């Protein structure tokens, strides 16, 4: 432990305090308050002056009372420069010593390898933890949850998290480490931390975000690894504590209100809707039926679902989620009580939402889940145009807890003041995520960047604020404003129908994708401006506001082309951007809107041609109808155009407001909404400004309006409407009817003069469909769709004139389609060329419309055939192009069979005569320039490919270098891990060896003790028994004091050896003396008996009694085996013992014999012998059993 190189002289603390006085903010317990690192004073939440006022108190709080007592072990200033006494000694990542980088804001240090840095950074350096906390606490980049919470509320939630971290077994981390028990703790641990300290800091409101709290909590694990080692039991517990902390912080970030409710666990806490309610879904887990749940968030194609009932949670694949409908997506045969209780709880939740927000909508059956679905469930079904129910943002949510919507989101104040449109500043409100894409850009690239920032940082806020934006910005006054700023500041872009789509886009596409949408939008809007402005210039009519937009267009053309191409290259798109944001979106609202807007262009154009009749009212009606395309879209398919016209007239201002919701009601896909919004901004204000002006420049199929035709049916099939319709007919052949309906709907609002009886217009639309195969040719096919709509007279006009759909208009239509389908690929020269052709066609159109000669029906049919031939010619002449959709977008001629005079048909036929020639010329021009455009596009693509390959090479080299650094770091970590494991294993082996030895010694001692005990017992048992002196078996017979035998053979075998020491031989003389005494007495008695024969028996009896007495004595003494026979063997002695007894018996009878003397002498001898050596076996060999 090279602590000597880490520590410094005692004055270092004061020096560093002076050094860090100003750059260092007041410390939270982890040594920093990272929000102060931001340069803007607005972002600071604590003043740096606090450091000076209570520096000692703060330090004691951070380091404990013993921090300043920590003295350096040596005064060797080896590592004074990198280590200045205010930083830790151990790397924050690997928890080891070494050459480290010190953070300027906190005590943490890092190895350069652990940070994957090739070289040490210059100047002040801030560690990743501090950067993370700074980002999390900065007002502009803080998370959605942090924008909703104040510091007090966050501190309140952190207290719950700390309580959950106090799990059983974490007692060691709940209080500071007692230095009395661990006096060396301060030598290793620079920054002590425990749960009690965390709780105190939370009470003091020292944490501005969850990241700061988590970073502080990680000190517990860091210190534990340093002091106890990475494999210690306490370290495992510390890891569990940190995992719990990470989980709790993550839950707070997901939804603070849900977290609080889950912690407080009130009655029906799961049924309380949040201020921004979570969508309800049917979610399915494997092995379970579809279950009602809240969708809190979605990530990587998975939905974080919280289920009703048991309140379980799970990540469910997004394709297994359906929006909440009244019926379960896939019915279950038998429902269990658990499911029923979950459904009841969900119904309570729905009621609470209705009580809080006033509305809740069940989605249609099996509607797939998409993000931001809460807006669909909050749509008012009775008044869909009103948008979503207003979500409370101003009120603080009172959940026994002050949870506010962030004060930064001041959405409720009106965005527009008065009737004039002004640019909405970022300071007033964070932009809706769609705002960057939807507004018509006036060239402020800086502002667009700022808006992009706003979309990312205020994602959630803008979601919540969509309804405000909708209601405040969609006012008719703002749309009608004639100032230049109204184009950019027109509030239409902020309609809520766009908020949902763009939020998904921002989540799921890269920034290049958003740039692409931005540029497509801008280019489209400028194309509209070009067409309108040129048409106005051609008619030489006063245009108040077109010229500024014209300048904007010319200023941005080159930049836009470059940007579009670069975006296309970045996204790897070989085909048209239509697929990016239009064709992919199977949308009818786009087409409807396009047709509506183009209707108004045709209307104002035709009305301008009828200058003799100042029908300004109709022109205004056209503009009004123009303002409300979505309202038109929403209405049911019309069968009476006049009614629609009146309806449009009467409801135009109101439906202006309603039209954002209109698109939503149709539940059109999000990209469709996106595009419909894009379609709105530029056409509306310009058309308002161009009221009464000519709009023949509009590159759509214009319809010849006679000056006296008031109620005639305007059949609009042009521009993008027809082009998109072609694409849509290809992708969604089932959906032509909405477009046709719109075509039938919109014209009536542009009636001009005469009264005509009701007639049935037959709309024949030949819409071209563009198909881009790879990067190659566009093939177009003509499809005719006939829509018949009964059109009663608007004002009872006797004759309704037919306006033929002029085929010569196909070229302008093509031009518009070309722009929208390949806007990324065109250069300025191509654009200007197309506009030039457009002007020529418009001039021809005006001439033909003024002529309007009569023609025959057959000629009209021939004209259509010619037009079709021209289309085929265009297709064949256009070489494989991936960028230009050479489609005569809509060749439609409405055949209106009139119940009135035939003059209408004749005039329309005559009007068609010069048209075929014009169309052929246009086709020739298009074919002529196709190759040139393709060459330019090929060159551009080659350059893009080269640039991309270069960039790829550079990035590959950088990637290789990064991977090498990564490999080195991993190798170093591997070596460190191996060395640590080796060291730990050696320690473990030593401990195991020592323990085994101790165990062996212990066992040996125990065994010895046991064996000694058993030996003693065996000895004792052995001593209790007599053993044979010859064979060592257990003895039965006793010879003398130390000699016993198991049997007679052993006695005989052992006798030669034992004879010398036998104790019985020592007692033999005494026995002989006793025998002599007995013999003498016997002799005396025998002599006395001889005198009297009567006394003999009695004497004999007395003698025998004496013998018995002596025998008993010898029996009692039992201590000797009389072996006094001089040299006789024991066997003879033993044999003689039995004979002796027989002799004694015979001697008893011998006294009765006559030969008394001889018998007495023999008996005396025998008696002495028997007493001497021939005792009975019982007397001679005593048996001793235990």
From Swiss-Prot:
- Record-annotated residues binding Zn(2+) 3? 255, 258, 274, 1028, 1031, 1046, 1050
Q: How does it assemble?
A: Monomer and homodimer. Interacts with NuRD subcomplexes containing GATAD2A. Interacts with the histone deacetylase NuRD complex subunit CHD4; the interaction is direct, appears to occur with monomeric ZMYND8, and is increased following DNA damage. Interacts (via N-terminus) with the P-TEFb complex subunit CCNT1 (via central region); the interaction is direct and the association appears to occur between homodimeric ZMYND8 and the activated form of the P-TEFb complex. Interacts (via N-terminus) with DBN1 (via ADF-H domain); the interaction leads to sequestering of ZMYND8 in the cytoplasm.
Quote the annotated effect of residue 1039 to S.
Found in a patient with syndromic intellectual disability; uncertain significance; disrupts interaction with GATAD2A
User: Which stretches of the protein fold into MYND-type zinc fingers, per the record?
Assistant: 1028-1062
Consequence the record notes for mutating residue 980 to K: Found in a patient with syndromic intellectual disability; uncertain significance
| Residue stretches making up the Bromo domain | 145-252
User: What is the annotated localization of this protein?
Assistant: Nucleus; Chromosome; Cytoplasm
Which residues, renumbered to this chain, carry the PTM Phosphoserine?
A: 24, 406, 417, 425, 432, 444, 460, 462, 465, 486, 490, 495, 514, 523, 547, 652, 655, 668, 682, 707, 709, 737, 754, 756, 1119, 1141
Q: Give TM regions.
A: none
| Comp. bias (Low complexity) | 766-799, 835-857, 1085-1103
Q: Which PANTHER family match?
A: MYND-TYPE ZINC FINGER-CONTAINING CHROMATIN READER ZMYND8, PROTEIN KINASE C-BINDING PROTEIN 1
Protein name as catalogued: MYND-type zinc finger-containing chromatin reader ZMYND8
């Amino acid at each position: 432990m090279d602590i000597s190189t880490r520590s410094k002289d005692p004055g270092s603390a004061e020096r560093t305090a002076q050094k860090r006085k100003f750059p260092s903010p007041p410390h939270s317990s982890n040594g920093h308050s990272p929000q102060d690192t931001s340069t803007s004073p607005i972002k600071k939440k604590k003043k740096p002056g606090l450091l000076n006022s209570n520096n000692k108190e703060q330090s004691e709080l951070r380091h404990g009372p013993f921090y300043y007592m920590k003295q350096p072990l040596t005064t060797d200033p080896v590592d004074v420069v990198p280590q200045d006494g205010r930083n830790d000694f151990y790397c924050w990542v690997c928890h080891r010593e070494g050459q480290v980088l010190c953070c300027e804001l906190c005590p943490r240090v890092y190895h350069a390898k652990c940070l994957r840095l090739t070289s040490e950074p210059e100047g002040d350096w801030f560690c990743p933890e501090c950067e993370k906390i700074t980002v999390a606490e900065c007002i502009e980049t803080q998370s959605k949850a942090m924008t909703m919470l104040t510091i007090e509320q966050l501190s309140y939630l952190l207290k719950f998290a700390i309580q959950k971290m106090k799990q059983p077994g974490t007692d060691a981390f709940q209080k500071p480490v007692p230095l009395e028990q661990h006096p060396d703790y301060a030598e290793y641990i620079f920054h002590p931390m425990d749960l009690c300290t965390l709780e105190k800091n939370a009470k003091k409101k020292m944490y501005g975000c969850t990241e700061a709290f988590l970073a502080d909590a990680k000190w517990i694990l860091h210190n534990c690894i340093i002091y106890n080692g990475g494999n210690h039991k306490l370290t495992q517990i510390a890891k569990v504590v940190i995992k719990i902390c990470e989980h709790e912080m993550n839950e707070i970030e997901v939804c603070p209100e849900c977290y609080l409710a889950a912690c407080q666990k009130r009655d029906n806490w799961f049924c309380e809707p949040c201020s921004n309610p979570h969508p309800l879904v049917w979610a399915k887990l494997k092995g379970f039926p579809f279950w009602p749940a809240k969708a809190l968030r979605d990530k990587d194609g998975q939905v974080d679902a919280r289920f009703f009932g048991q309140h379980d949670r799970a990540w469910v694949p997004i394709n297994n989620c359906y929006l909440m409908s009244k019926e379960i997506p896939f019915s279950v045969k038998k429902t269990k009580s658990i499911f029923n209780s979950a459904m009841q709880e969900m119904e309570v939740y729905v009621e609470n939402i209705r009580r809080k927000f006033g509305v809740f909508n069940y989605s249609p059956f099996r509607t797939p889940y998409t993000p931001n679905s809460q807006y669909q469930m909050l749509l008012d079904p009775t008044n869909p145009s009103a948008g979503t129910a207003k979500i409370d943002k101003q009120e603080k949510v009172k959940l026994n807890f002050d949870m506010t919507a962030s004060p930064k989101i001041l959405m409720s104040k009106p965005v527009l003041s008065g009737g004039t449109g002004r640019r909405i500043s970022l300071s007033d409100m964070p932009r809706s995520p769609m705002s960057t894409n939807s507004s018509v850009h006036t060239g402020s690239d800086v502002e667009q960047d700022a808006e992009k920032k706003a979309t990312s940082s205020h994602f959630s806020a803008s979601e919540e604020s969509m309804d405000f934006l909708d209601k405040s910005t969609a006012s008719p006054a703002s749309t009608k404003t004639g100032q230049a700023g109204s184009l950019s500041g027109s509030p239409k872009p902020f309609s809520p129908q766009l908020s949902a789509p763009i939020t998904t886009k921002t989540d799921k596409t890269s920034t290049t994708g958003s740039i692409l949408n931005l540029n497509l939008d801008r280019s489209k809007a400028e194309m509209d401006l070009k067409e309108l402005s040129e048409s106005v210039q051609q008619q030489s009519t006063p245009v108040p506001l077109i010229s500024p937009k014209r300048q904007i267009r010319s200023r941005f053309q080159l930049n836009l082309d470059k940007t579009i191409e670069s975006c296309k290259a970045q996204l790897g798109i070989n085909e048209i951007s239509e697929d990016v944001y239009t064709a992919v979106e199977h949308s009818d609202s786009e087409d409807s809107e396009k047709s509506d807007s183009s209707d108004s262009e045709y209307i104002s154009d035709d009305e301008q041609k009828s200058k003799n009749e100042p029908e300004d009212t109709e022109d205004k009606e056209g503009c009004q109808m123009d303002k409300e395309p979505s309202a038109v879209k929403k209405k049911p398919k019309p069968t009476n155009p006049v009614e629609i016209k009146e309806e449009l007239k009467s409801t135009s201002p109101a439906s202006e407001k309603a039209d954002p919701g209109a698109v939503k009601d149709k539940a059109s896909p999000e990209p469709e909404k996106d595009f419909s919004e894009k379609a709105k901004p530029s056409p509306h204000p310009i058309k308002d400004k161009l009221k009464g002006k000519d709009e023949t420049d509009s590159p759509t199929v214009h319809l010849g309006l006679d000056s006296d035709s008031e109620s005639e049916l305007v059949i609009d099939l042009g521009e993008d409407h027809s082009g998109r319709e072609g694409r849509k007919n290809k992708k969604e052949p089932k959906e032509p009817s909405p477009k046709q309906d719109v075509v039938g709907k919109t014209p009536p609002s542009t009636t001009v003069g005469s009264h005509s009886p009701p007639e049935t217009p037959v709309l024949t639309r030949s819409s071209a469909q563009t198909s881009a195969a790879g990067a190659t040719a566009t093939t177009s096919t003509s499809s005719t769709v006939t829509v018949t709509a009964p059109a009663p007279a608007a004002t009872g006009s006797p004759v309704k004139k037919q306006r033929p759909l002029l085929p010569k208009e196909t070229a302008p239509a093509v031009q518009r389609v070309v722009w929208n389908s390949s806007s990324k690929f065109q250069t300025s020269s191509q654009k200007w060329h197309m506009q030039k052709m457009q002007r020529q066609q418009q001039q021809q159109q005006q001439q033909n419309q003024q002529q309007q000669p009569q023609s025959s029906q057959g000629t009209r049919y021939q004209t259509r055939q010619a037009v079709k031939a021209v289309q085929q010619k265009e297709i064949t002449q256009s070489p494989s192009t991936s960028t230009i959709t050479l489609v005569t977008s809509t060749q439609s001629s409405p055949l209106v069979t009139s119940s009135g005079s035939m003059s209408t048909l004749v005039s329309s036929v005559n009007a068609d005569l010069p048209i075929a020639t014009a169309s052929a010329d246009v086709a020739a021009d298009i074919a002529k320039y196709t190759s040139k455009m393709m060459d330019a596009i090929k060159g551009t693509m080659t350059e893009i490919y080269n640039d991309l390959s270069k960039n790829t090479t550079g990035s590959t080299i950088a990637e290789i270098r990064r991977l090498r650094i990564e490999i080195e770091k991993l190798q170093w970590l591997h070596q460190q891990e191996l060395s640590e494991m080796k060291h730990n294993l050696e320690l473990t082996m030593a401990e195991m060896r020592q323990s085994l030895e101790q165990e062996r010694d212990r066992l040996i001692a125990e065994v010895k003790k046991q064996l000694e005990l058993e030996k003693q017992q065996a000895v004792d048992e052995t001593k209790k028994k007599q053993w044979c002196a010859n064979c060592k078996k257990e003895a039965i017979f006793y010879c003398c004091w130390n000699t016993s035998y198991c049997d007679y053979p052993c006695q005989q075998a052992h006798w030669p050896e034992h004879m010398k020491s036998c104790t019985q031989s020592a007692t033999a003389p005494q026995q002989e003396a006793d025998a002599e005494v007995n013999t003498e007495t016997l002799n005396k008695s025998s002599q006395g008996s001889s005198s009297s024969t009567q006394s003999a028996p009695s004497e004999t009896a007395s003698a025998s009694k004496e013998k018995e007495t002596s025998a008993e004595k010898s029996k009692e003494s039992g201590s000797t085996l009389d072996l006094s026979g001089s040299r006789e063997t024991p066997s003879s002695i033993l044999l003689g013992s039995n004979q002796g007894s027989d002799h004694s018996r015979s001697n008893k009878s011998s006294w009765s014999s006559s030969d008394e003397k001889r018998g007495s002498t023999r008996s005396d001898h025998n008696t002495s012998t028997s007493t001497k050596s021939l005792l009975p076996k019982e007397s001679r060999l005593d048996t001793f059993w235990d």
